Amino acid sequence: MNPQLSPKAIREIREGTCNPLGAPQVTTDLSENIILTSLDDLHNWARLSSLWPLLYGTACCFIEFAALIGSRFDFDRFGLVPRSSPRQADLLIVAGTVTMKMAPALVRLYEQMPEPKYVIAMGACTITGGMFSADSTTAVRGVDKLIPVDLYLPGCPPRPEAIFDAVIKLRKKVGNESILEREKTEQTHRYITYKHEMNLVFSQNTGEYLNKTSTNVFPSSKKEKITELPENREQTEIINSEEE
């Protein structure tokens, strides 16, 4: 290499040798106004910023969800717009107990929602049946037996702050999805693989204990301490005067 060449000339010769086309030159104005991203990131950014929940409340948990609409919590800042039609919603928040009669309507609403769609199970009654799972014959023991659930939100009922936390976690899940891999990762099954085992216990309130001899026979030791009650008020006054 010629020692008389300047360092700048040597650098240009090396760049031309390594990359004959040269490095791409981007001006300062373009670098400050152009954002390089992928189609997945752009698509997910648009979806997670505009989750439209379907208003579906069957019990007291919906009162906490309705509080989000007010100015105190203002869930519009998350891009949540409540919808009354399943065809315009992509998020189903099941808030409250689901009964056997309401189960077909819930499944129908879920099937009418366009893809991609997400489900949040809100409250203990929605997740496991709650306090109605012990003796109710009409409560569904978990909404995941009917439709696939993406996020579980326990509580009785959950606070509005907990609903915000669930929405933020769902946004993170939406942001990590890929258009090409969505068919492989989405939940295609409706029913879960495990069952909520409920052991059948026979009722003990049969009334048989009333027919037992131990409940009908009065103890002889207590019979001696029982005195005859007075028939009228005059006899009561006489007894009281004798005691004085």
UniProtKB/Swiss-Prot annotation:
Ranges where the record places region Disordered: 221-244
Catalytic activity of the protein: a plastoquinone + NADH + (n+1) H(+)(in) = a plastoquinol + NAD(+) + n H(+)(out); a plastoquinone + NADPH + (n+1) H(+)(in) = a plastoquinol + NADP(+) + n H(+)(out)
Keyword annotations of the record: 4Fe-4S, Iron, Iron-sulfur, Membrane, Metal-binding, NAD, NADP, Plastoquinone, Quinone, Thylakoid, Translocase, Transport
Disulphide-bonded residues: none
EC number: 7.1.1.-
GO molecular function, one term: quinone binding
Lipid bilayer topology: Peripheral membrane protein
SUPFAM superfamilies assigned to the protein according to its UniProt record, in alphabetical order: HydA/Nqo6-like (SSF56770)
GO biological processes: aerobic respiration; electron transport coupled proton transport; photosynthesis, light reaction
Location of this chain's protein in the cell: Cellular thylakoid membrane
Binding site for [4Fe-4S] cluster: 60-61, 125, 156
Cofactor: how and how many bound: Binds 1 [4Fe-4S] cluster.
Entry keyword Zinc: no
UniProt subunit comment: NDH-1 can be composed of about 15 different subunits; different subcomplexes with different compositions have been identified which probably have different functions.
Family, per entry: Belongs to the complex I 20 kDa subunit family.
Protein name as it appears in the record: NAD(P)H-quinone oxidoreductase subunit K
Protein species of origin: Prochlorococcus marinus (strain MIT 9312)
Lineage: Bacteria, Bacillati, Cyanobacteriota, Cyanophyceae, Synechococcales
